[in-house]
């Protein structure tokens, strides 16, 4: 079920489009769950994102055949070889919906607006096919909101969610005799949170998808996400932490006091610090004995730390 933003700066459900990073804890939990479920090697199978040419949907292509073609692109990308998607269109609140049956045939419904505006068909289908992928994995979060955030996060981190961010745009529209700006958005993450997950993906795979964005607003949100993700790499006890963070960390270590993102424990083997891996957010525990290089047991990211 993909959220659909109505014209006029409205988000799914009729509220204003939310900005910033209000769901960051859930996004990080989703990344951890994804790595735990499919492993670091499984994530590496998605090193290449869905290319824009594969989901281009020209106006002269048959509506239903084109939708089936784009759905097959997503099925192939998410490695669901035996899944068959049947795509239809109707008026509804959300951008899309999928019936999560036993398979192998799945029925996807898309909002009727995609009949005439085909730019975001790939984005909506990416989200719905990811629902099928997660259903087959048996991976879900309790509650609709958190489960949709999991779906958006997985779609984005595994290479198709840049389409969801690119669906965020502001355009001039004529209403009656007035010219006004209308905003469109897909998904449950904020634009900046989509950018954050894309930044995490870029760091993991060395991929730069910014040239693929058609939307200037999506590009700005991606850059905001890059900046926020960069902060994760400058948190103590990581070696790249700034002077202020290092100074506070040293003070907290002496007092064995919890700090922003880290905590200490003292035992027979000495003091150890626990903090989140900036890639998968699995907790890492290291001895407090100066500069060292650590490897996350879950995602295999190597980190320089000064504990």
Residue positions per predicted region:
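Short pre-active-site segment immediately N-terminal to the catalytic Zn-binding motif
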Residues: 106-125, 143-146
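A structural motif
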Residues: 121-128, 161-166
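N-terminal alpha-helical scaffold/docking segments in eukaryotic complex subunits
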Residues: 2-58, 142
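Active-site recognition of the HExxH zinc-binding catalytic motif
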Residues: 123-139
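Post-HExxH zinc-binding segment in Zn-dependent metallohydrolases
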Residues: 144-179
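Pan-zinc metallopeptidase signature
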Residues: 2-25, 29, 180-307
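Auxiliary, metal-adjacent structural segments of Zn-dependent hydrolase domains
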Residues: 36-103, 114-118
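Low-complexity, Gly/Pro
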Residues: 3-12, 58, 82-97, 163, ...
């Amino acid at each position: 079920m993909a959220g659909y933003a109505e014209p006029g700066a409205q988000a799914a459900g009729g509220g204003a489009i939310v900005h910033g990073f209000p769901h960051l804890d859930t996004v990080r939990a989703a990344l951890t769950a994804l790595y735990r479920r499919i492993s670091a090697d499984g994530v590496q199978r998605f090193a290449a994102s869905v290319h824009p040419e594969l989901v281009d949907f020209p106006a002269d292509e048959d509506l239903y055949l084109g939708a089936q073609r784009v759905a097959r692109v997503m099925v192939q990308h998410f490695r669901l070889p035996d899944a068959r998607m049947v795509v239809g269109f109707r008026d509804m609140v959300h951008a899309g919906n999928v019936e999560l049956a036993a398979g192998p045939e799945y029925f996807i419904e898309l909002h009727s607006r995609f009949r005439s505006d085909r730019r975001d068909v790939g984005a909506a289908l990416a989200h719905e096919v990811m629902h099928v992928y997660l259903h087959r994995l048996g991976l879900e979060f309790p509650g609709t909101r958190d489960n949709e955030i999991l779906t958006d996060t997985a779609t984005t981190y595994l290479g198709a969610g840049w389409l969801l961010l690119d669906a965020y745009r502001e355009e001039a529209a004529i209403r009656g005799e007035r010219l006004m700006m209308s905003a469109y958005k897909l998904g449950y993450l904020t634009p900046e949170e989509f950018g954050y997950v894309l930044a995490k993906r870029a760091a993991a795979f060395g991929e730069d998808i910014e040239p693929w964005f058609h939307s200037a607003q999506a590009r700005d949100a991606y850059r905001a996400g890059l900046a926020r993700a960069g902060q994760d790499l400058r948190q103590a006890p990581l070696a790249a932490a700034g002077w202020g963070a290092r100074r506070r960390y040293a003070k907290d270590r002496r007092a064995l006091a919890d700090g922003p993102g880290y905590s200490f424990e003292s035992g027979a083997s000495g003091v150890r610090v626990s903090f989140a891996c900036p890639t998968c957010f699995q907790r890492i525990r290291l001895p407090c004995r100066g500069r060292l290089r650590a490897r996350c047991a879950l995602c295999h990211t190597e980190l320089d730390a000064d504990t």
